[in-house]
Design a protein with these regions (language model features):
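Hydrophobic faces of well-ordered beta-strands that scaffold small-molecule active sites
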Residues: 2-8, 42-44, 75-79, 98-100, ...
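Conserved anion-binding
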Residues: 8-21, 91-180
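Catalytic cores of alpha/beta
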Residues: 65-98, 189-224
Length: 435
């Protein structure tokens, strides 16, 4: 599939030619990641960190912006990650994977008998965050591994380096540096040789400039990281996503599973052809192809129960798609919330409770208790309910009742302070990753 890249330099989103010459610059990173994440993973790269343009604390003009993006999508982050502490911090802040460049290699290698990798660092890194979270860059110039912001090469060939690097990574990112930003196509022969040499996931970058090349790389078994072609409009993520799907295997129809973003509950399953995907991306509402009516249909166009699309992800075989959605009403024609059960209502979740609280404050209804809660009163109720839960609840039923009361008042307090449950989940996830 396709991974969109957000490269940052001097606090701006940029695209460089050959890693040196500025071609374009923009300042809409938030809008970009919100758009890019609909189609797949997003690579966020700190070019200043890669080039060691840092202050005494190791920060760059991009640090604040980069950290703010990590929880806004399925993000892999790279650029200047040279120690385990930095990698752990980025993972704890929300990055799903880290991209290791120069630090992975033995840059002092002069003979074939010298080690290829910085094995001590890589072993410590895998122990700290897990091999599955590590990507190693096998960027190359004229077939030699490039380091230090692509300013130098080391005495390591692409293929021998890749064979060793896969021992410490879940995937390899290959950038053909001499093709980077040139919009002339990548080096397909080098990519093919790399793909045949290793067993892990391979992502190709540098020069990819057409849907035809993306499709060819997909058939080769490689994912593609897009930069210049995306920003200049030569390739759209919509077309790239669709071009990677295997319609031949499924007679032109791809099964699409709709999953509630908030509860992770499966809502429904339908089939989509290319035109249905195009309409889904255009409207941001999940659209299928009706095999009985032989036409496109957007879920909700009759009932008003639309499925607003957050993101789409293809499976490993590219013949099934998972759509993460925000449902507006139930999905099933029977009136049930989901097509996979008899429950007629949306499952109660903390997010749903929070949404109801927000609605009560925004549009108070006569007799609404929630709307009467001022800051002082809600804090008193949190303390009161916590005491009842810990001191008065004796039976299982008592604990359930008091815990529900406490969560309600905690949710009200959070709303008033501008904190939502996703913020809390992120903090819990951060603590888990730090262990």
């Amino acid at each position: 599939m396709v991974i969109a890249s957000i490269d940052m330099k001097d606090g701006h989103v940029v695209q460089l030619k050959n890693g040196k010459d500025l071609v374009l610059q923009r300042d809409d990173a938030d809008a970009l990641i919100n758009e890019f994440n609909m189609y797949g993973e997003v690579a966020v790269i700190d070019l200043d960190a890669a080039m060691r343009n840092t202050d005494e604390k190791g920060n760059t003009p991009n640090t604040k912006l980069l950290k703010s993006l990590l929880h806004k999508g399925n993000v892999r982050v790279g650029g200047g990650i040279r120690d385990v502490k930095k990698a752990r911090e980025l993972i704890s802040l929300g990055a799903e994977k880290v991209i290791i460049g120069s630090a992975a290699w033995n840059s002092e290698r002069t003979s074939d008998s010298d080690p290829i990798l910085n094995t001590q660092f890589l072993e410590e890194l895998c122990s700290a965050i897990g091999k599955q979270r590590v990507i190693i860059s096998v960027d190359a110039i004229n077939g030699k591994i490039a380091v230090k912001g692509w300013k130098e090469t080391v005495n390591i060939s692409l293929i021998e380096g890749a064979k060793e690097a896969q021992k410490y990574a879940s995937e390899l990112l290959f950038t053909c540096v001499e093709k980077e930003g040139c919009m002339q196509g990548t080096d397909m022969e080098q990519v093919k040789a790399l793909r045949e040499a290793v067993s892990c996931r391979v992502v190709a970058a540098g020069g990819v400039n057409s849907l035809e090349q993306i499709s060819a790389l997909e058939k080769m078994g490689c994912d593609v990281q897009l930069g210049m072609a995306l920003y200049t409009g030569a390739v759209s993520l919509k077309d790239a996503f669709i071009s990677c799907l295997d319609f031949e295997k499924t007679n032109g129809m791809i099964p699409v599973i709709a999953q509630d973003e908030r509860s992770s509950q499966v809502m429904m399953m339908g089939y989509a052809n290319k035109e249905a995907f195009e309409k889904t991306f255009a409207t941001k509402k999940l659209t299928f192809f009706s095999r009985t009516r032989n036409c496109l249909w957007t879920k909700g166009e009759t009932s008003g129960h639309f499925l607003e699309v957050v993101k789409l992800r293809a499976d490993c075989d590219r013949d099934t798609v998972l759509a993460t959605v925000r449902p507006i009403g139930g999905a099933c024609h029977t009136g049930s919330w989901t097509c996979f059960g008899s429950d007629p209502d949306e499952r109660s979740t903390l997010e749903r409770l929070y949404g109801t609280i927000a609605e009560r404050f925004a549009n108070p209804k006569p007799g609404s208790y929630t709307a009467t809660l001022n800051d002082k009163r809600v804090r008193e109720k949190v303390m009161e309910e916590a005491e009842e839960l810990t001191d008065d609840a004796e039976t299982k039923e008592d604990i359930i009742w008091e815990a529900a009361d406490l969560l309600y008042f905690v949710s009200v307090l959070m709303y008033k302070e501008g904190v939502n449950w996703q913020d809390v989940y992120n903090e819990l996830d951060k603590r888990h990753k730090e262990k």
